[in-house]
């Protein structure tokens, strides 16, 4: 049976209306039998996650069973996930990036969870459109805006086909534009996305830095 989404409203003590009893505006979902959906739920619109206790819809960046997930902040549809194996590949890339930087006297970059899920989402998008332009036609950095990530400087490296972190880093370091991003002194944070789609690997590096005041 198709589940139905709706916002739950209860009258507050002040006499006005608040979304949910606690006023948080969280969404819940009920199945055709009127039971609150909890846990994972998939329908024609996509995949969602509802809190196992309160049934509230996950939005934004959420850790579930030790894995990071990105859910649309408006609709709650899952946009990306980072499995343990994918994160291990991404972490190795970050390690190699920082080896390149520190060997040249540059500061190492800090792994940022928000950039990690943004990069994971971008990696999946590359399987639809291999470009710095997203499948919806917007530029790659709109995913940062959507997640509320503030930055003064930003960069993106993309790649496809390389089977290991060492190979993709070698290719990036032998490309002047990609190398410039990896060694950019203005960046201080990094997120790396890696995914396999139909047996084909896609890679993304996202960098951000603040303006010096």
Where would I find each of the regions flagged by the language model?
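Extracellular adhesion/carbohydrate-binding repeat motifs centered on closely spaced tryptophans
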Residues: 1-88
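A mature extracytoplasmic/lumenal domain signature
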Residues: 34, 54, 73-75, 113-115, ...
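A short alpha-helix/helix-coil micro-patch that ends at or immediately precedes a cysteine
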Residues: 82-129
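Surface-exposed patches in mature extracellular/periplasmic domains of secreted proteins
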Residues: 103-117, 130-140, 179-195
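Short, surface-exposed glycine/acidic/tryptophan-bearing loops
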Residues: 117-166, 182-184
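Disulfide-stabilized extracellular recognition modules
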Residues: 159-213
